[in-house]
Structure formats: C-alpha cells, structure tokens
C-alpha cells in the first residue's frame, strides 16, 4: 500500500492490493479517502467501527452492475426488516438518492447519527416513506 494521488498531487485513497497474473498487466485496488476518514473517526469516537444495518441484502440493477448511469434504486433481495420486503426498490436514504449498493452504503454511513433512518422505497408501483431504527454493528 501507499498513497493514491490525483493529478494535482492530492491524496484520494490508499492502495491496498494488486492482482497480477500471466498475461495481465496488473489491477490495483484502493480504499477511498472518505472511507478511511470514516473508519478513523469511528475509532476515535467509539474505539471501534459502528455501522447502521437495515437487515437487508440488496441487488443492483443491471445498469449499475455494468457501470452505466441509472436512475433506478436498489432492489431488496432478502430482508429481516419488518418494514422492507423482498422486491422493494429503495430510492433514497435520509433524503439522499441511491442508485447502487455503493450509494446505499455511503448514504447510510454519511447521514446516520442516531435514532431512525428515513427510507423511501417503491413497492408494487407505490412510493412509500418509512422510518426504520437500524441495528448497529
């Protein structure tokens, strides 16, 4: 690992691993700076990383899976939540639109402080707003 810098020399992440093989030049993986800052702040405040969890397994749209821009939300694949069901499409978390699982996780991480989380989702064509108290893991 080492610093990942943009063209201006600003730190944007930390290189964490590299995949190389026969006939492959090499693929590098990095941890984004906002994730590093989140983890460091969590350790400073709590002595461990605490993450809100809504008890759902999600599935990206096919557009999001292949990296295309999309306005679709993320689909609930499985749920242990009393509010969300399999097949629901989550559109926003605390007012932040989500179009991929990465967006969902970032919105949870960046907007949750305590109490409940407002989730707007679509079920059978109807848009529904609900507040959910997450499990903290």
List each language-model region with its residue ranges:
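Short, well-ordered loop/turn sites that connect or cap secondary structure elements
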Residues: 5, 84-85, 111
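PDZ/PDZ-like groove recognition
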Residues: 42-107, 120-122, 126-137
